[in-house]
């Protein structure tokens, strides 16, 4: 997928002052219509996921059962949660602050990645996710002038993008170390010194939803 130029801007119809944007906002302001549209969109995402082998409901229940004991450790009582985090989000009336949103985020993200390539019905969810993330990272790469040592992913949700970014940065770090070792000048009769190990990479995720963080902890433990 080609990267968008830095100057790209969203289509003008998303603006509220555009006729289509105004119409969309008006339609969504009618509660029965909003509920119907969100319900249909949710069904579409779930149908895409389950049609490609993602067990949406079983995975949701598994994540919630494993994450509930981690909720207290993922909660910061002093954190000030902004209003938009409590606002209705997609099909979730409680926004990001609910188990349903947190325990379905992984499946929904995979489903959305699959929908980027509708012409490839055999595409596996993990392959679609990897392809999508690598397209994003390829757009980031030119702006990185040197090694990355520490990353904070703001609004990390359940860590799908966070873990993908960590893996990509580790690969980038290893490739740079290998290239540096090949470029070391050889001296006759002297064994080349081994390349210095790369500095540790720290990638952290930050989110104001304790439910999201609890699920992220479960997913991190699964990857170990």
What are these regions (language model features)?
Residues 108-149, 164, 168, 172:
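Conserved alpha-helix/loop element of class I SAM-dependent methyltransferases that forms part
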Residues 10-106:
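N-terminal auxiliary segments of SAM/dcSAM-dependent transferases
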Residues 150-183, 192-224:
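Class I SAM-dependent methyltransferase SAM/SAH-binding core
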Residues 78-81, 90, 101, 128, ...:
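Mature, folded catalytic cores of secreted/periplasmic enzymes
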Residues 1-3:
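N-terminal chloroplast transit peptides
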Residues 80-89, 125-130, 194-203:
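Glycine-rich, flexible loop segments associated with nucleotide phosphate handling
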Residues 84, 124, 128, 132, ...:
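Short, well-structured alpha-helical patches and their helix-loop capping segments
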């Amino acid at each position: 997928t080609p990267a968008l130029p830095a100057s790209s801007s969203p289509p003008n119809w998303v603006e509220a002052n555009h006729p289509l944007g105004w119409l969309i906002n008006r339609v969504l302001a009618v509660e029965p219509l909003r509920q119907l549209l969100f319900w249909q969109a949710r069904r579409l995402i779930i149908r895409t996921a389950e049609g490609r082998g993602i067990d949406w409901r079983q995975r949701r229940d598994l994540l919630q059962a494993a994450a509930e004991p981690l909720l207290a450790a993922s909660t910061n009582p002093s954190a000030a949660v902004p209003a938009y985090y409590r606002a209705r989000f997609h099909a979730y009336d409680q926004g990001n602050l609910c188990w349903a949103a947190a325990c379905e985020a992984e499946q929904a993200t995979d489903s959305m990645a699959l929908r980027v390539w509708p012409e490839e019905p055999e595409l596996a969810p993990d392959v679609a996710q990897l392809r999508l993330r690598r397209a994003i990272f390829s757009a980031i790469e030119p702006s990185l002038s040197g090694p990355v040592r520490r990353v904070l992913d703001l609004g990390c949700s359940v860590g799908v993008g966070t873990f993908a970014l960590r893996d990509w940065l580790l690969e980038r770090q290893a490739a740079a170390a290998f290239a540096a070792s090949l470029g070391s000048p050889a001296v006759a009769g002297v064994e080349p010194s081994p390349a210095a190990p790369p500095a540790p990479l720290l990638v952290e995720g930050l989110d104001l939803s304790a439910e999201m963080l609890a699920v992220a902890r479960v997913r991190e433990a699964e990857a170990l």
